Amino acid sequence: PASDAGLRVVKVRTGIVQAANGGTLRLLRPLFAAGLGGRLGSGRQWLSWIGLDDVIDIYHRALYDDQLSGPVNAVGPEPVRNTEYTEVLARVLHRPALLPVPSFGPRVLLGEQGARELAEANQRVIPSKLMSRGHEFRHRDVADALAHQLGRE
């Protein structure tokens, strides 16, 4: 392994990336556009999100910051519960979020990939290492990240 050879190793653990044309936004936008957006299940599951611009910055830093090594959480500094994420996305898109999606809903509505991503999303992760090193996030909260990605700033 690289670490045995004395090389610096950074293991970037990436959260749910918020990108206008990919990931969960690509899957959720049509539902919200049709007025079918809503919290998933209980809505209490955590979402450790990261804006696309920020994830690019973090990978760049992982490559070039010689002081950074080991596991690094590439997530935004403020994880949110699914209920809050849903409310923010609805507000940014100017669409209602009235219909809660039952627990089997993600597989039916979002397919295997979407259901898998959302099932893995129930984690409250903090970017402690980055924050302790003074990393500056472009988007500190999910509302700002979603507004930026969806061109609603």
Kindly label every feature range from the protein language model:
Residues 117-153:
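C-terminal amphipathic/interface module of NAD(P)-dependent oxidoreductases
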Residues 27-49, 91-122:
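Alpha-helical membrane-targeting segments
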Residues 2-11, 15-46, 52:
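NAD(P)-dependent short-chain dehydrogenase/reductase
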Residues 58, 65-113, 147-153:
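Mid/C-terminal beta-alpha module of Rossmann-like enzyme folds, strongest
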Residues 29-37, 45-79:
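Alpha-helical substrate-binding/gating segment
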Residues 19, 47-53, 80, 125, ...:
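Residue-level signal for the nucleotide or nucleotide-sugar donor/cofactor binding architecture
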Residues 12-14, 76, 126:
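A secondary-structure boundary/capping signal
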